[in-house]
């Protein structure tokens, strides 16, 4: 009798552990590629700054179109587990092509199938609702795994790319997706769409207000991601070309920010019900403004590393609370809500990529940091019109 009673708990713990490991592995793959991508495009593919910007814009547009289509399909009848498996398999092949085929035009087609993370978070939310887990902290711990991956990934990426080659780095990312696919296949649950999900209670706003608030939140998160993506694209080149510091410092900065981001994310999740999502997002925006302004004045590695606490507050709240905000505004469409949040990052890449190369060629890297501060100002104004739930 005792054996029977403990079996479901063990199964649930194994499933939860599988979700955490999948989040970590997908995070590692992204953390290996993204920090070094602008250097890869500039040095390996000999792309000009404006072409680097166009790369991020084009790939993000394709990513939005594909992921939004799959999100609608999965909310109606699709099996999210199969979509995650498909995404992992395709990305594995794409990273292998990255390793051997250094062609700029083909590289712009490499991001449209990155639907693994939104679908994984949507599946995790549904699994938590069905099994009675506390949704906020479970989602926060999942997102923290990606942040943990970004502690390890960027320094490892620079070590592999600069110490060995970009080929070794991309093959390592491909291996991560192979392992990820095996875990998804063996341990993640399949949840049918025709079974009603019993969600934890949230405040249900009138449909018109929810749509308006969802649109405003989309603008808020898009502006926040655009500011962050401007920083991500230009920070490695700014550190090397403008400040004449070592290339490994860029990886260390990203890694430290990601490490500090984890406790910030967990603290935000803990206090969310006490102080509300909107106030937390406002704290994130103010922290981001202070961070980008301070980066312009910093000239030494020690100061650059110390400033990452502000970046961690900004990203920890955006990553941990932003997705939950969308899900609570769209409780009946968890997949679409999660993908909509993921697409704010892609819109951020579009905005950042569109202005990045042009502004660098006309002005300087400094102008981009001031632009990032302006974007956060727009986000703050829009946030004030969103109801806190």
What spans do the regions from the language model cover?
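Helix-to-loop junctions at the C-terminal end of transmembrane segments
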Residues: 65-79, 161, 264-276, 360
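Helix-loop boundary and gating motifs at the non-cytosolic
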Residues: 5-60, 228-242
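Cytoplasmic helix-loop-helix junction between adjacent transmembrane helices
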Residues: 108-144
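C-terminal transmembrane helical hairpin of 12-TM major facilitator-type secondary transporters
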Residues: 278-322
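Structural signature of the two symmetry-related core transmembrane helices
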Residues: 82-96, 174, 279-294, 370-373
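Juxtamembrane intracellular "pre-TM" segments in multi-pass secondary transporters
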Residues: 1-13, 189-221
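Hydrophobic core of transmembrane alpha-helices in multi-pass small-molecule transporters
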Residues: 24, 101-119, 222, 303-317
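A late C-terminal transmembrane helix in Major Facilitator Superfamily
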Residues: 332-362
């Amino acid at each position: 009798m005792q054996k029977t009673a403990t079996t479901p708990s063990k199964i649930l713990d194994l499933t939860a552990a599988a979700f955490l490991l999948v989040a970590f592995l997908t995070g590692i793959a992204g953390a290996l590629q993204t920090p070094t991508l602008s250097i890869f495009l500039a040095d390996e593919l000999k792309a000009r700054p404006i072409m680097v910007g166009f790369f991020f814009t084009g790939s993000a547009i394709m990513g939005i179109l594909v992921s939004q289509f799959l999100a609608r399909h999965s909310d109606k009848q699709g099996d999210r587990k199969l979509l995650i498996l498909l995404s992992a398999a395709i990305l594995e092949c794409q990273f292998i092509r990255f390793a051997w085929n250094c062609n700029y035009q083909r590289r712009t087609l490499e991001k449209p199938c990155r639907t693994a993370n939104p679908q994984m978070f949507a599946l995790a939310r549904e699994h938590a609702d069905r099994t009675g887990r506390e949704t906020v902290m479970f989602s926060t711990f999942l997102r923290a795994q990606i942040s943990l991956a970004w502690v390890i990934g960027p320094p490892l990426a620079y070590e592999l790319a600069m110490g060995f080659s970009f080929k070794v780095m991309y093959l390592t990312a491909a291996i991560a997706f192979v392992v990820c696919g095996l875990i998804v296949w063996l341990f993640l649950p399949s949840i049918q769409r025709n079974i009603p999900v019993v969600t934890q209670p949230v405040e249900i706003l009138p449909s018109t207000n929810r749509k308006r608030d969802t649109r405003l939140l989309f603008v808020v998160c898009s502006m926040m991601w655009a500011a962050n993506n401007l920083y991500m694209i230009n920070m490695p080149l700014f550190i090397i070309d403008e400040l004449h510091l070592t290339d490994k410092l860029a990886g260390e900065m990203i890694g430290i920010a990601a490490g500090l981001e984890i406790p910030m994310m967990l603290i935000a999740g803990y206090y969310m019900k006490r102080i509300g999502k909107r106030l937390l997002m406002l704290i994130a925006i103010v922290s981001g403004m202070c961070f980008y302004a301070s980066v312009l004045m910093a000239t030494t590695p020690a100061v650059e590393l110390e400033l990452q606490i502000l970046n961690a507050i900004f990203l920890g709240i955006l990553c941990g609370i932003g997705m939950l905000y969308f899900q609570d505004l769209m409780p009946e469409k968890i997949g679409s809500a999660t993908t909509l949040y993921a697409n704010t990052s892609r819109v951020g890449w579009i905005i950042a990529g569109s202005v990045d190369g042009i502004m660098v060629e006309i002005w300087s890297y400094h102008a981009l940091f001031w632009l990032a501060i302006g974007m956060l100002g727009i986000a703050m104004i829009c946030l004030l019109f969103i109801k806190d739930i």
